[in-house]
């Protein structure tokens, strides 16, 4: 036998054995756990009516999955510094078997972007292996822009929302990163940042504040009339940050300045991504304080108003946790309804701009007792967790067209509710929520966002005055009371 014939025989034998092994795996684990391949993933787009996501061949796609990090990697999780390809592959096998089709994962400054203008090989090598595993299992990946989880270089420890040099560095990051992965279908969309928030007060905002007021009013007399207070020449030229008990119009103006900063931050990064990958989808992972239905303080409003952000983004994302009456402990039916009404009111406002909406973080604890807050919260069952998460999806369905649970696994190292929010226990066994998630995944993928106006017509709810909510400390609580009343009546 010649060398060429020997190689051909070996190749055929290898193909036969590979096929036999794959068949055995399919029979033993079920088709859902069988890996896909890169060619099975189609590029995701927003449909022409901006109601939902579709594949490039026109099929509806509903991102239904998890935020990915592993237990045993510390807190905050060291996703890339403790990257284990074997463990990641097992995680993807498990996710595929339970209906996950999309994972959101944090990129970090220390692993990917220690110096402005240069991507780190350390992070890129792990990222490319992560993408390859995702392609192998036919699961989309939703990367979130550089975060603090694995440490911050000195240049990124300053304000990276308003500081011009920091924003320029982020623009360059996206030029490099999005350009490198242009056209890679496995990447569902880019999330610019996890829960960005414009600072309440710093030197850059102080520099911009006089210019904002001068552009808006033109004269101190006009400003005095609007604020209904006397404005001195000094106050006109060097205005102070308004106190929270100050004139409502003054507070609103300052909040609008913060929104202007947020708009510029988003616009510049979106433009950077689109310049190197015009078909890439881009969003921002909004904290729930971006919709001021409930704010611990007017200063905690993020400045990222959904109706303003929507003009720059392909779709909108929001995160939600049940905090309507403090830390939700499953104690009463009234608490449950208050939190469901709160969730609906937040997602409703995010849907208002007419873009698809993904609830990119949600979930709550179950399957034990939390150790946080001196252990004061009562234990919760896995069934309570599963019921809450399923209800959250049900109440936002029709407004949202995607949901990503916070955590694949419980994470005992966490210093917050993440300790018990996973689909799976630390040992990899499925919780009640994993089984419910799997059940929902079989039907949720046909879901599609309704137009906001259509939903409004079918769900009579009180109008939300966004401007008052970010400038009047008493407005939001009254709104929530009225909203809950209407929500309860509809139930």
Segments from the language model and where they lie:
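Bacterial N-terminal signal peptides that target proteins for export
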Residues: 2-17
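Bacterial N-terminal signal peptides
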Residues: 18-28
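Mature N-terminal, pre-catalytic/accessory segment of carbohydrate-active enzymes
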Residues: 33-67, 470-491
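Active-site mouth of glycoside hydrolases
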Residues: 41-313, 369-372, 380, 396-405, ...
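Active-site clefts of carbohydrate-active enzymes
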Residues: 245-253, 288-289, 319-334, 346-386, ...
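Well-ordered, non-membrane alpha-helical segments in soluble/globular domains
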Residues: 266, 339-344, 383-390
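Aromatic-rich peripheral "rim/lid" segments of glycoside hydrolase catalytic domains that contact
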Residues: 369-491
């Amino acid at each position: 036998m010649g060398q060429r014939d020997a190689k051909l025989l070996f190749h055929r034998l290898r193909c036969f054995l590979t096929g036999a092994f794959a068949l055995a795996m399919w029979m033993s684990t079920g088709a859902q756990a069988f890996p896909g391949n890169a060619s099975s993933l189609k590029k995701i787009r927003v449909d022409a009516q901006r109601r939902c996501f579709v594949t490039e061949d026109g099929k509806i796609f509903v991102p239904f999955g998890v935020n990915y990090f592993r237990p045993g990697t510390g807190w905050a999780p060291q996703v890339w510094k403790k990257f284990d390809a074997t463990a990641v592959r097992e995680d993807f096998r498990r996710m595929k078997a339970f209906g996950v089709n999309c994972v959101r994962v944090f990129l970090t400054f220390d692993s990917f972007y220690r110096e402005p203008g240069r991507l780190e090989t350390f992070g890129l090598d792990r990222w490319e292996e992560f993408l390859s595993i995702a392609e192998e299992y036919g699961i989309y990946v939703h990367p979130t822009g550089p975060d603090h989880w694995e440490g911050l270089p000195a240049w990124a420890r300053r304000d990276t929302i308003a500081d011009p040099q920091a924003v320029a560095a982020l623009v360059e990051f996206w030029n490099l990163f999005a350009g490198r992965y242009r056209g890679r279908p496995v990447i569902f969309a880019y999330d610019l940042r996890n829960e960005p928030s414009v600072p309440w007060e710093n030197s850059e905002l102080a520099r911009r504040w006089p210019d904002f007021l001068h552009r808006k009013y033109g004269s101190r007399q006009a400003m005095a009339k609007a604020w209904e207070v006397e404005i001195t020449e000094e106050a006109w030229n060097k205005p102070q940050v308004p106190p929270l008990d100050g004139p409502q119009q003054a507070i609103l103006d300052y909040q609008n300045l913060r929104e202007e900063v947020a708009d510029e931050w988003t616009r510049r990064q979106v433009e950077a991504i689109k310049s190197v990958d015009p078909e890439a989808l881009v969003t921002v992972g909004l904290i729930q304080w971006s919709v001021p239905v409930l704010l611990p303080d007017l200063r905690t409003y993020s400045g990222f108003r959904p109706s303003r952000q929507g003009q720059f983004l392909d779709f909108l994302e929001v995160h939600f946790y049940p905090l309507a009456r403090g830390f939700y402990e499953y104690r009463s039916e009234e608490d449950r309804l208050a939190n469901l009404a709160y969730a609906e009111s937040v997602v409703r406002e995010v849907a208002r701009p007419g873009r698809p909406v993904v609830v990119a973080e949600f979930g709550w604890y179950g399957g034990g007792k939390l150790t946080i807050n001196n252990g004061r919260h009562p234990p919760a069952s896995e069934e309570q967790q599963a019921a809450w998460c399923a209800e959250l999806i049900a109440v936002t369905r029709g407004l949202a067209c995607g949901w990503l649970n916070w955590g694949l696994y419980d994470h005992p190292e966490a210093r917050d509710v993440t300790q018990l929010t996973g689909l799976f226990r630390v040992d990899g066994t499925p919780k009640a929520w994993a089984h419910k998630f799997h059940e929902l995944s079989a039907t949720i993928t046909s879901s599609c966002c309704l137009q906001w106006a259509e939903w409004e017509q079918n769900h009579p709810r009180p109008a939300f005055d966004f401007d008052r909510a970010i400038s009047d400390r008493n407005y939001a609580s009254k709104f929530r009371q009225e909203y809950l009343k209407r929500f309860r009546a509809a139930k």
